[in-house]
Amino acid sequence: MLLTGATGDSLSLRVSGYQFPDAEDPRKRYSWHMVSGEAGSAEGSWDFEWQALTCDESPRVSAWLRAAASQEGPAPLTFLEPNLRFRLAGDDAVGLVLKVDLDLEFLPPWNRHGYTGKPTTLRIAIGSECLRAAADAWDEEREHGAATGRDRE
């Protein structure tokens, strides 16, 4: 999934597998998705990977993006791990404005600290069609990433 704003901020996210791909107990094996990505802002670009979403949380990303694209004004999307948060911050001449907060293991290397609550925020002005396409891509990549994780058994 790729979100690219008109002002240059960007975020690429994908499910890259499971945290515990070799666990014998399927409840443990399929409990956490590994999320990897790249982010870019005026300050620079960086990569990250962490077990940031439970398998139950992962589908909420595409549902939230679709709700935002429909301008339903969804509430901020937060997760059990505080690495990632999506907020709808209004609109501008380009389209909707998303704010994506990246915290803890998703922070850029020049802004890392050992506590939560001081995220790096990407501002992404993006059209509704691009949000729908990102939601579709997330669903497809999530299924592929999960299948890749199962293949390692």
Identify the function of each model-found stretch.
Residues 1-47:
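N-terminal domain-start interaction segment
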Residues 4-6, 14-16, 40, 56, ...:
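A structural detector for beta-sheet-dominated domains
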Residues 14-15, 44-55, 110-126:
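Short amphipathic beta-strand/extended segments with alternating polar/hydrophobic composition
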Residues 30-73:
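Short, well-structured hydrophobic secondary-structure segments
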Residues 59, 94, 129-132:
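Generic structural signal for well-ordered, non-transmembrane alpha-helical segments
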Residues 67-86, 143-153:
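Short glycine-rich, low-complexity/disordered patches
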Residues 76-118:
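Amphipathic protein-protein interaction modules
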Residues 103-153:
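Mixed-charge, glycine-accented linear interaction segment located at domain edges/termini
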